[in-house]
C-alpha cells in the first residue's frame, strides 16, 4: 500500500471516530490495495464495521462529502460499505470471507 492511500485511510478513520466515536468498531481496507495488486485504475475499497446500535447507511451517507473531496483533491475513488458488527462476525458470505481473509485493519 502506498503512502497516499495510507494517508487517505488514516484521514477517513479519524473523521469517522471524531463524528461517531465508539460506534466505529473497525475500518478495514480490502480489495486490490489490501492484496497489493492494485493499478492506476483501482479504487480504494473500505469496509466500516459499526456497533449494532449504529445505522450503517447513515455512516455511508455521512462519508459522501469527504469521499467526493478525496476524489477531487487526491484523484482517488473510494468505495465504502458499512456493516453492523454482529453481522460481520456472524456471517461468512463470499464477500465477508474475502474481507476477513485479505483485509488490512486501518
What are these regions (language model features)?
Residues 1-25, 35-36, 40, 51-106:
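Catalytic core of pol beta-like nucleotidyltransferases
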Residues 32:
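Basic/aromatic recognition patch in beta-strand/loop cores that engages polyanionic ligands
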Residues 45-49:
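Short beta-strand->loop micro-motif that forms the acidic, two-metal-ion catalytic signature
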Amino acid at each position: 500500500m502506498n503512502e497516499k492511500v495510507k494517508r487517505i485511510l488514516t484521514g477517513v478513520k479519524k473523521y469517522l471516530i471524531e463524528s461517531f466515536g465508539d460506534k466505529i468498531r473497525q475500518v478495514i481496507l480490502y480489495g486490490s490495495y489490501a492484496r497489493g495488486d492494485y493499478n492506476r485504475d483501482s479504487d480504494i475499497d473500505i469496509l466500516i464495521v459499526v456497533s449494532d446500535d449504529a445505522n450503517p447507511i447513515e455512516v455511508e451517507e455521512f462519508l459522501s462529502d469527504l469521499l467526493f473531496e478525496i476524489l477531487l483533491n487526491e484523484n482517488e475513488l473510494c468505495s465504502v460499505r458499512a456493516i453492523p458488527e454482529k453481522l460481520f462476525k456472524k456471517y461468512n458470505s463470499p464477500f465477508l470471507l474475502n474481507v476477513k481473509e485479505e483485509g488490512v485493519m486501518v
